Amino acid sequence: MARAKFLREKLHVNVGTIGHVDHGKTTLTAALTKIGAERFGGEFKAYDAIDAAPEEKARGITISTAHVEYESAVRHYAHVDCPGHADYVKNMITGAAQMDGAILVCSAADGPMPQTREHILLSRQVGVPHIVVFLNKADMVDDAELLELVEMEVRELLSKYDFPGDDTPIIHGSARLALEGDQSDIGVPAILKLVEALDTFIPDPTRDVDRPFLMPVEDVFSISGRGTVVTGRIERGIIRVGDEIEIVGIRDTHKTTVTGVEMFRKLLDQGQAGDNAGLLLRGTKRDDVERGQVLCKPGSIKPHTEFEAEVYVLSKDEGGRHTPFFKGYRPQFYFRTTDITGACQLPEGVEMVMPGDNVKMVVTLINPVAMDEGLRFAIREGGRTVGAGVVAKIVK
């Protein structure tokens, strides 16, 4: 165990706090940095420093997010905390801060509230894979039965949205007492228990490079005497010379073989996630491939035209629409590298959607796009972004 201290390269995991306003998300975030710094290294961030989160622009959307870091014995955590409910909604839908797992903070005194529910639902929709619960303000509840009742309510809520409610770790504690250095069960030890739950309950994330190969097509060139070169940034996986790939999206899927990988005009044996590469394709004409398609490992991704999405509509101040839209709205959906027109079907009982709202909708595209659940997209009108969304469920 003593050796672990010297390993600089701890596994990196992204987490964040979610939950109802004033249930103690930011206090807990501060406590995690303080106790992490004392035990495992890192830097303590005080409540005020976290609360004064700067505004950031992510894809033209204004989001306030605080980023902090702390360590456990085995991992390095990057943690996001948002000051306002609207910031959470935007953050989760745009994927500005991707989470490998979330810490749901729920006040033991109040129990689950509307935003508790909404954040769990959003986590399900946008594909946050794991949730660990911190029942905060346990110092304000004397009745053990009441604590049990709140815990049961939280478990039921999690199960309702397809999280494993019965198996989810729920830690009782007081973030405020922990910050003050209190050593009772609900003080510092509760924070250590929470970190241990993060370590054990959130599995190691799969690195992009270990996932099946995928590269969105940005450009297509024809090089005389050599054939067709497709350029783009490799989103995931590794591609080697001689690998068979599929070209997916817009038109019928077809297979080909990669006969060359180039980067910065140099020939390589392979390209991997994060690389901007040019791939030479065997027997492929320039007109066989277009921007908006993807090159991928055969069978790893399918083209779809209809999906359920969770969408945030930009407000007027963010450069979005000034007026609401109604059912049958037909904007462009920008996936990876291209715009595809689609029609929006609103949920029953929703007549119109106002700028600044978030809404669940079913989208039908005029051409198929290679997609998985969790894929992010922008909604545009004539090149101007008016919304951001994520594929929650594929319909067909």
UniProtKB/Swiss-Prot annotation:
Region (G5) location: 174-176
Entry keyword set: Cytoplasm, Elongation factor, GTP-binding, Hydrolase, Magnesium, Metal-binding, Nucleotide-binding, Protein biosynthesis
Binding positions for GTP per the UniProt entry: 19-26, 81-85, 136-139
UniProt-recorded name of the protein: Elongation factor Tu 1
Binding, Mg(2+): 26
Keyword Hydrolase: yes
Organism: Xanthomonas campestris pv. campestris (strain B100)
Region annotated G4, chain positions: 136-139
Region (G3): 81-84
Catalytic function, reaction form: GTP + H2O = GDP + phosphate + H(+)
UniProt-listed Enzyme Commission number(s): 3.6.5.3
Cited NCBIfam families: EF-Tu, PRK00049.1, PRK12735.1, PRK12736.1, small_GTP
Enzyme's top EC category: hydrolase
Cellular-component GO terms for this entry: cytosol
Chain's role: GTP hydrolase that promotes the GTP-dependent binding of aminoacyl-tRNA to the A-site of ribosomes during protein biosynthesis.
Subunit structure: Monomer.
Pfam annotation, one family: GTP_EFTU_D3
One annotated GO molecular function: GTPase activity
Keyword Manganese found: no
Region entry G1, spans: 19-26
Region of interest called G2, as start-end residue ranges on this chain: 60-64
Domain of life according to the entry: Bacteria
Stretches assigned to the tr-type G domain: 10-206
Similarity comment text for this entry: Belongs to the TRAFAC class translation factor GTPase superfamily. Classic translation factor GTPase family. EF-Tu/EF-1A subfamily.
Record localization: Cytoplasm
